[in-house]
Regions:
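Conserved active-site motif detector
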Residues: 1-101
Length: 101
């Protein structure tokens, strides 16, 4: 049986200073942000030291084709899950990561 991989778009990488220290292959932690007043399916991305680096994209305008939106991912994960940053474009403010369980 073929393994099904889940990829996500992480946005706002350019909004957090620490994002400039990201590198391909970094392990990130995703947490549901239940108290987010703008998006009730918000999922925030952290480095392992709990430094914020971005959010899982949740808009048709920001989700890269072939990746899961935060809304699609929200009910498939627990409160916290890991991911590996596959590549990113810091100037454009987004990256693609693979969910690891």
């Amino acid at each position: 049986m073929e393994e099904h991989r889940i990829y996500i778009t992480i946005n706002h990488l350019d909004d957090f200073e620490c994002a400039s220290f990201l590198k391909t292959g970094d392990r990130l932690i995703l947490n549901k942000e239940r108290d987010n007043i703008y998006d009730d399916e918000a999922i925030i991305a952290y480095k392992e030291n709990k430094t914020k680096v971005g959010y899982v994209a949740n808009s048709v305008h920001s989700v890269a084709r072939g990746t899961y939106s935060a809304g699609r991912l929200y009910d498939r994960i627990g409160d916290e899950v890991g991911c590996i940053l596959k590549f990113f474009f810091l100037e454009e403010g987004y990256g693609i990561a693979e969910i690891i369980e």
